[in-house]
Curated annotation (Swiss-Prot):
GO biological process: negative regulation of pheromone-dependent signal transduction involved in conjugation with cellular fusion; protein targeting to membrane; regulation of endocytosis
Catalytic activity from the UniProt record: L-cysteinyl-[protein] + hexadecanoyl-CoA = S-hexadecanoyl-L-cysteinyl-[protein] + CoA
UniProt-listed Pfam families: Ank_2 (PF12796), Ank_4 (PF13637), DHHC (PF01529)
Species annotation: Naumovozyma castellii (Yeast)
Membrane topology field: Multi-pass membrane protein
Domain DHHC residues, every copy: 455-505
Protein name as annotated: Palmitoyltransferase AKR1
Amino acid sequence: MSDINTESGESTSLPNSTDPPLSDVNIDVEDDDTAESISSLQPIVSNTTNPPEEPINPVLGQYHQACQKGDLATVKQLLDSGVLDLNTDLTGDITGLHWASINNRLSVVKYLISQGIDVNAKAGDLEATPLHWAARYGYVHIVDCLLNKGADPTMCDMQGFNLLHLAVNSSNVMLVAYVLFFVVAKGIIDIDCQDPKGRTPLLWAAYQGDSLSVMLLLKFGASTKIVDEGGFTPLHWATVKGQPYVLTHLIRDGADFFLKTNDGKDCFTIAQEMNTSHSFKDALSICGFNQDGYPKRKLFKKSDHAKVITFFVPLVALSIIFILFTHLHPLFALLISLIFGLAVNKALKELILPSYSNYGLHSTSLLKSPFLSGTFFGSLLLLTIVWIFKIAPFTIFKSRLLTNFFMFLILMQIYYLFIKLIFSDPGCVPIETDHENVRGTIKELLDTGKFDIKNFCLETWIRKPLRSHFSTLNTHNVARFDHFCPWIYNDIGLKNHKNFMWFILLTEVGIWFFISLTMKYFDILEDTNEDVACFLLGDDELCAGFVYDRFTFLIALWALIQSVWVGFLIVVQVFQTFTGVTNKEFNKYVKEKKNQHAFDPIFFNDTFNTTPEELRNDDDDTAASRTGNNPNHSNGTTIPSEGSRINTRKPRTCFNLCFAITGLDQVRTIVRETLGIGGANEMSRMQLLSSIPTNYGWKRNLADFWLTSDVMAPIWRRLFYSPVESRALLNGVEVDYFKLYDFPEKTYPEPTGPESV
């Protein structure tokens, strides 16, 4: 059964289609605010253990039980034999169609409708139709079938709830999406329809903390201004719940947080009383307001101007820090640099970042800004200046002409790739805006039993291609998404992944060319100056560089440090291209492997899939088992609130943050999961690699990644050029990654000898 709780962190949950059928219940809800709030989420409540006053007909009992269990053969036998008449199918006004609908028995529903049963029959004290019963539990396929067979979506139960109200109360966002596109978009139901208490679907979604439904309702133009009989707007009820994403959606849409209820309470007062002030103030900050609800002061009218400043700040900061270490004692330079760094960080957060246009659900951070890409650019520019004005003049005629020439070529290529990657299209899948096309997509997914958020994108209204991921930076699904790279301030995907590989390879090679030339330069300094000795560096060329050109020494040291994490990044990327997997996919497979045998008393159906058993296939069951969404469990269909997620997530330390930025966390995962260092056994490692559906063998994987699908082009062009459109190789076959819904099958040759990876 479903439940609702106003405490932050709780979420509604719905039974899976494989739950035991509901029977021996009585629909009886008291007419008060609490009962009304709960009744739509608990449509069928056993309030009494008293048996019916008159004995149940054994034939009707057998028939209803068959409808509940989905026993189509028994239903057909009873109706075909004539022992049961659909017109007398009553047990307390509850028909077999009601029982089949609320238990997600699609085949029984279709058969009963084909036999002429009344699809709008009312049942129970609430006088609810089968459509209402199915909607309360979020069963999209049943709702679709009933609507196609004449069920009236405008009918209300005794509580005044219509199809849209009940869809929202089910907390199944896929049903909400279906009703919005197939009913609301056609003008059959008003998006702002109110129940007898004046509560709109948006108000109910806000009260439940259902951020996905709130997002969809707002996309369809739901009003944030309408108040219920108590003077509460959706934002007031969202403040009661305290779900930060819901608050952010509503405030960004223009909800008035100063508006007072009939009791004279605004959102600030409600947040304080309900202990949700932290979530409310965070939402205000994300939407550009201070803690008092007034717009933050912005230094820049355009977000792009603030981003340009953020990009160039690291260049200035690095220059100052290197100058400090060049002319001051290292301890004093370190102290001043720390103070200076904290001041820069504070200035950026307080003065620059508020000018960003934030369309996401989280506050803008330096990690999600051009700051790190500016750090790379500043480092590269300082290295270039040192090479041009200090190193090249001394080494170009000292048997290092060819090395300097290659250094020039590498630097030019790095600059070119860096700029190209920043402005590149990672492979954004076009957004769908035509409602008719969206309805066609939904119908297709319903027919295949794949109408869930794993296959349908709620943000862009498209069928999600395999290997794609929605990017908040680009606000599109990115085909063959790998990861977001803060060093180029862009996503890495199908269209720019190969350029990214060339970029990091050339960066690593360029650093070592620079180190080689720097050592030659220091050797010249040692020969042309007095001999000196250093405490840790000895008396060779390193000491000469430190004493006679400390700025160049520091730049070389900084470059050497960067080469370490770039090298690890190359290892990760090469490993993943060998195994035919992206960064995001590998992390997902590792997580699934860890959770495969974990027991959790609460299983969340985070894909919102309510496909009836009749439409499921073996692949669906296998996938559900791998992801923890086993249909044999009573899964909820509401994603836990952000508050509950944060409470169960380990806090990220500074050490872990540095690991994530430099990619060392990926190296650690690869070493542990594939080399067996850290606990993974041989069988576990082989299971992980074999579970990757895009791993077709290392030779095939490399060819798929490095060669374009244009087989008529020269081999050099296929190697160095990235995919221009959405087509690329997968298992040697050209596929359209914008419409990739099935993987090419793996072929397993007959073993004739020792198998190779």
